[in-house]
Amino acid sequence: MLRLLGEGGFSYVYLVQDTSDSALYALKKIRCPFGQESVSQALKEVEAYTLFAPHPNIIHSIDHAVQNDSSTKVSGIGNEASSASKTVYILLPYYRRGNLQDTINANLVNHTRFGERRLMQLMLGVCKALKAMHQYHVRNTPSRAAAKAVRDEAAGEDADAARRNARAQKRTMTADQTHQQDLNDEQEQPLMPDDEITRAQEGKKPGDARAYAHRDIKPGNIMLSDDGRTPILMDLGSLAPSPTPITSRSQAIAVQDIAAEHSTMPYRAPELFDVKTGSVIDTKVDIWSLGCTMYACLIGKSPFEARSDETGGSLSICVLGGDWRWPGEGNNANKGKAPSRSNTQSSVNGNVNSEQQASNERIYPHPAAREVVRRCLQVEPSERPDVDELMTLIDTCLSELPEDDEGHNPAAEL
């Protein structure tokens, strides 16, 4: 183990080296101190990696293991033995160039910016990853079966411990309390089952469609291959079946709570901030997040983070209202719609040389790039493009961008 690469919540990612051939890997360590729920969530990520492998734009796991921590116990009731805390280890490829957030940070430090052509080419790769998820077809693979077996075994152990604790608890309850607890146990159904990835494929035959949404697209979850040309989408712990119909208020609250935990706020779609009964959460959440990601690569932060900082208002209110701007646009701007080049230059320069400057200089980002972002950031999911339409929009954008507009990117030189 060489060094810590990153951390968040109960997970840590380390740079590790194979002693036999000196190969470098990323080792993700996920502490699971809360029994079945946290173990199942961690192994859900393991299973998600196997669904799409091999895909050039989606990270794959090399190996994984579940380890009991004999020194730590989950607190039980009475004198019943309780299950040991577990740690899930996931071995992943290591990418020395880091992720798009590293590129954004480098640009901010060095006062440079992302070349629009290079960004759009990378976004095409991300769209290919999303297409594999949004248009996934069921298949049977040995690796997925193995991941499910490990998940079922770990969940079974924790379920046994939970039953032991429940029996111990009942022994301390009165008859009336025990009867009420039995009724509660019978009525209680999981709103969002931990094995929802597996259950989503029940009744499906190999070849049948079964869409999934990533639900946490952001610059930090898009790695760059060692050649700097291929984006790799990572962190599949937030993966969820799509569409997800919201049929009750309790389910709406559950989905909203899960989004608050697993979907990064500045990149989270508005329908996940305020989940309504009768609505449907689908793959369009990823299109919104990808629009925020493109904006962040071009400007340095999420559009709603930027707007919230500018106005001092709530980020969530900005998201729900679709309130964002390109730098330099006034409050009457049409929700980030790209102005014409000449009009923008005239308003900025305000002198007789403005038209000449407009011919020699162009606005950044290019109007074609702005239009792609604007199409993604529609508050109504139905008004956003699907992944195929977005790929067409990006292709059109690339055809309009100057060939020499690569921009200076310090991350490309790492």
What residue spans do the PLM features occupy?
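Conserved short submotifs of the Hanks-type protein kinase catalytic core
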Residues: 85-99
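Terminal C-lobe "cap" of eukaryotic-type protein kinase domains
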Residues: 379-404
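C-terminal lobe of the eukaryotic/viral protein kinase catalytic domain
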Residues: 84-85, 302-381
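Glycine-rich ATP phosphate-binding loop
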Residues: 12-32
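Protein kinase glycine-rich loop
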Residues: 2-8, 13
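Short beta-strand micro-motifs within the conserved protein kinase catalytic domain, predominantly
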Residues: 60-85
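Activation segment/activation loop of eukaryotic-type protein kinase catalytic domains
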Residues: 167, 174, 182-185, 193-197, ...
